[in-house]
Amino acid sequence: MTNIRKSHPLFKIINDSLIDLPAPSSISSWWNFGSLLGICLAIQILTGLFLAMHYTSDTTTAFQSVTHICRDVNYGWILRYLHANGASMFFICLFLHVGRGLYYGSYIYKETWNVGVILLFAVMATAFMGYVLPWGQMSFWGATVITNLLSAIPYIGTNLVEWIWGGFSVDKATLTRFFAFHFLLPFIISALVMVHLLFLHETGSNNPTGIPSDSDMIPFHPYYTIKDMLGALAMILVLMTLVLFSPDLLGDPDNYIPANPLNTPPHIKPEWYFLFAYAILRSIPNKLGGVLALVLSILILIVMPLLHTSKQRSMMFRPLSQCLFWLLVADLLTLTWIGGQPVEHPFIIIGQLASILYFLLILVLMPITSIVENHLLKW
């Protein structure tokens, strides 16, 4: 008799995706982040569900309801901080996952890559709306500043912003709809994850060498299930350390002040994981130009397959490209730092130079370096 996991219609899908899936034998720990992102998503949905049971999306009671969760609900404080810091872990894993894709040329699988970029946008939208919900000072002013950027769109901008706000300013209608969308989007993300995996399993995983590994595959279980469990353990250890020892390390103290439309905080800034894009936005003196640069800073990932000029897929054997890749990482860290600084000298000029370098590296220097490496290999 055939094993039930190979014959049952539902178990067969799970078996082909998680148990008998052929995987390259050489994939390193950089391939762990897909499963870690899945765990992050599960943590966020579960903690978010329980938080939603106690949260009220009304401007008069939202801030109090979050305080009530932390003080009066059994283990409410741990739910709240798991959710807040879980978002940070989510983005750390996301950035490392995308970075791995760039380094090892995973973007050659266009369908998987494009769904991944859509996922990145969806997660960023979800995180932004979630940051508005506690209705602190930074929530309110962050929502005001970021939604107001849409007014830079010619002709329809102002109408679009008022339509999103549900009025003439960020108010009760805005908070209610942001809560509704913040609850809905993770389930859309879950569906997109399925599509992402569907496309990935059409081609199979890439590997560090970038060379097809069809002749050297091993079953996903037990080798990579054990490996993923180790990665999950490490991530949960970091997350719990953050939650239990310094839960507010990555947050903004201003968000412990209830939202006040009459009092603007001295430095309006988003959560740390948006700072690099915020720095690019601020470095351009023109509003529409800034908004375009902000969107393009992430949308640029879509054109990565077109910018691939190397004859090798991975950067593993391309030392010049490796140098530029790590320069890009350093540049993104610089932008993240600048995004959290006030708009004054010398931070303005550093931000502008870092923004120019970011686009220059991706659009010009990396493709040219790949062509140079192709010629060097001929010798």
From Swiss-Prot:
Q: Name one GO molecular function term.
A: metal ion binding
Q: Which residues bind heme b b566?
A: 97, 196
What the entry lists under InterPro entries is as follows: Cyt_b/b6_C (IPR005798), Cyt_b/b6_C_sf (IPR036150), Cyt_b/b6_N (IPR005797), Cytb/b6-like_sf (IPR027387), Cytochrome_b (IPR030689), Cytochrome_b_C_euk/bac (IPR048260), Cytochrome_b_N_euk/bac (IPR048259), Di-haem_cyt_TM (IPR016174)
Q: Gene Ontology cellular component?
A: mitochondrial inner membrane; respiratory chain complex III
Q: Provide the residue positions that the database annotates as binding heme b b562.
A: 83, 182
Its GO biological process annotations read: mitochondrial electron transport, ubiquinol to cytochrome c
Report TM segments. Answer: 33-53, 77-98, 113-133, 178-198, 226-246, 288-308, 320-340, 347-367
Q: How is the cofactor bound?
A: Binds 2 heme b groups non-covalently.
Alphabetized, the UniProt keywords read: Electron transport, Heme, Iron, Membrane, Metal-binding, Mitochondrion, Mitochondrion inner membrane, Respiratory chain, Transmembrane, Transmembrane helix, Transport, Ubiquinone
Pfam families found in the cross-reference section: Cytochrom_B_C (PF00032), Cytochrome_B (PF00033)
Q: Where in the cell is it found?
A: Mitochondrion inner membrane
Membrane topology per record: Multi-pass membrane protein
* Positions annotated to bind a ubiquinone: 201
> Which prosthetic group or cofactor does it need?
heme b
| Chief site of localization | mitochondrion
Q: Beyond the main fields, what else does the record say?
A: Heme 1 (or BL or b562) is low-potential and absorbs at about 562 nm, and heme 2 (or BH or b566) is high-potential and absorbs at about 566 nm.
Main function? Component of the ubiquinol-cytochrome c reductase complex (complex III or cytochrome b-c1 complex) that is part of the mitochondrial respiratory chain. The b-c1 complex mediates electron transfer from ubiquinol to cytochrome c. Contributes to the generation of a proton gradient across the mitochondrial membrane that is then used for ATP synthesis.
- Family membership, please give it: Belongs to the cytochrome b family.
Quaternary structure (record): The cytochrome bc1 complex contains 11 subunits: 3 respiratory subunits (MT-CYB, CYC1 and UQCRFS1), 2 core proteins (UQCRC1 and UQCRC2) and 6 low-molecular weight proteins (UQCRH/QCR6, UQCRB/QCR7, UQCRQ/QCR8, UQCR10/QCR9, UQCR11/QCR10 and a cleavage product of UQCRFS1). This cytochrome bc1 complex then forms a dimer.
Q: What is this protein called?
A: Cytochrome b
What's the source species for this entry? Pteropus scapulatus
What lineage is this protein's organism placed in? Eukaryota, Metazoa, Chordata, Craniata, Vertebrata
The gene it comes from is MT-CYB
